[in-house]
Amino acid sequence: MAQRSKAYKAAKAAIGEDLYSPVEAIRLAKETNPSKTDATVEVALRLSVDPRKADQMVRGSVSLPHGTGKTARVVVFATGDRAEAARAAGADVVGDDDLIARISEGWVDFDAAVASPELMGKVGRLGKVLGPRNLMPNPKTGTVTPDVAKAVTDIKGGKIDFRVDKHSNLHFIIGKTSFEAKALVENYAAALEEILRLKPSSSKGRYISKATVATTFGPGVPMDPNVTSVDSSEL
């Protein structure tokens, strides 16, 4: 097990074992960030769903009101006018068979992929590469669309995708430690609202059983999973 830094241990001690409201937890995660870098702030939720069942898969996307703090690298599978529109919207790489071949050889240096619908038959072959990395274009997240330019603009503007993993955990970022705490809280509130909206009707009991927020190199701050209404005015 890796040795923890003194800064990490100090942050862990400051957090203690308490269960915090989301607003308090996010503020504390930001304030106790042990790194001098502008770290990413990430939330982890444990959901009471069984992702092996098709009707309990939680997957979606949301545009964070204050963005993510990073410029996402976006690739687009498109041809003709749609390819030109994607380039004009700021896509980092646009292609068809050439892009598919490049990715099939292991290149995955991007954060999101968008596809024009008519190309999904070919893009689907990349499932073994893109699927495990949650990069496969999907209509449910708006990344399989004829309007590839809008998809690129949305992603560059702070749209994030999320998907529950096989252990029923769901991870998503809410910004950087350089953000004001209010902005981080409002980003979390937007994501939480969408995740709650997507609760499967077949999911019984408490939907969110565990919640934690942490910076890249910081300890997790436990949040009360029963608090589903978040108000930044509490800051």
Swiss-Prot record:
Gene3D superfamilies: 3.30.190.20, 3.40.50.790. Disulfide bonds: none annotated. InterPro entries: Ribosom_uL1_bac-type, Ribosomal_uL1, Ribosomal_uL1-like, Ribosomal_uL1/biogenesis, Ribosomal_uL1_3-a/b-sand, Ribosomal_uL1_CS. GO terms for cellular component: large ribosomal subunit. GO terms for molecular function: rRNA binding; structural constituent of ribosome; tRNA binding. PROSITE patterns: RIBOSOMAL_L1 (PS01199). It holds the Pfam family Ribosomal_L1. The keyword Ribonucleoprotein applies. One of its GO terms (biological process) is regulation of translation. Keywords: Repressor, Ribonucleoprotein, Ribosomal protein, RNA-binding, rRNA-binding, Translation regulation, tRNA-binding. HAMAP family: Ribosomal_uL1_B. Belongs to the universal ribosomal protein uL1 family. Part of the 50S ribosomal subunit. Binds directly to 23S rRNA. The L1 stalk is quite mobile in the ribosome, and is involved in E site tRNA release. Protein L1 is also a translational repressor protein, it controls the translation of the L11 operon by binding to its mRNA. This is Large ribosomal subunit protein uL1. It comes from Micrococcus luteus (strain ATCC 4698 / DSM 20030 / JCM 1464 / CCM 169 / CCUG 5858 / IAM 1056 / NBRC 3333 / NCIMB 9278 / NCTC 2665 / VKM Ac-2230).
